Amino acid sequence: MKNKLYQALLLIFLVAGISSCDYLDIVPDERPTEEDAFKDKNAAERYLYSCYAFMPKEREGCYLYQGGDCLTDYDRKFLEGTHTAANIGDFAYWSRMYAGIRRCYTLINNVDAVPRMEEELKIIYKAEANFLIAYYHFMLLRAYGPIIIMDHEVSVSSTEKLKRSPFDVCVKWIADKYDEACNNGLLAVQSSSYYGRATQLAAKALKARLYLYAASPLFNGNSFYANSSLYDPETNEPLMPLDYNCLLYTSDAA
């Protein structure tokens, strides 16, 4: 009986001793930090490319529909009407696009501190990041309508309460963001070594597409939204334009 008591006490002391050790809580030295991402020119370039990594493909998810129905439960959700903006798999952009937006702001806020990096290159990187911020907001707008505009970097631990902006406000903000990129360092043409990176032509083309979508009857005066829940919870003002305007954005597009 005494031996069992001694064994129990010994076990308690051992567990207490192990739990008090903090040598397992040390962050590994090789784990990258934000400072590592901007420690030199090459690291900054890698970080810029990581900002592009959030771009979705226009055909994303299409290969799922080339297989049998047994491969996915998408068809079942469609038939049952249980699809929502949050559970559409490869087509759910919300978290992914906002993660990309935050990364772009991180680059903008830190690239100036990169040592031995040409000032002109820093300006180009920030312009490309602004282009991506506009593009990611556009993808969100296309998928969800009125969205939360992120005009600054928000900490992952932030408790800031954010709300959706009216559709026309979102459109103007995105268009202005494309203009900001074009007017502040975005290259007219990229060299063949940087094929696929943002250019002024891409920004202007996407701005035109933004206006095309916004002026279409899908978003412009669609009566479907009159009875929806797309209203500002504080002012009770509609977030979607309820009256059709055939001249909407014509002066801006010109």
Residue ranges and their predicted role:
Residues 21-63:
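Membrane-proximal, proline-rich intrinsically disordered regions
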Residues 249-254:
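Conserved small/polar residues in nucleotide/adenosyl-binding loops
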Residues 1-29:
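Bacterial Sec-dependent N-terminal signal peptides
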Residues 141-142, 148, 213-218, 222:
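Short coil/turn linking the two alpha-helices of tandem helical-hairpin repeats
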Residues 222-247:
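A solvent-exposed, charged loop/short amphipathic helix patch at secondary-structure junctions
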Residues 40-41, 45-56, 75-144, 158-195:
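Conserved, well-structured interaction surfaces
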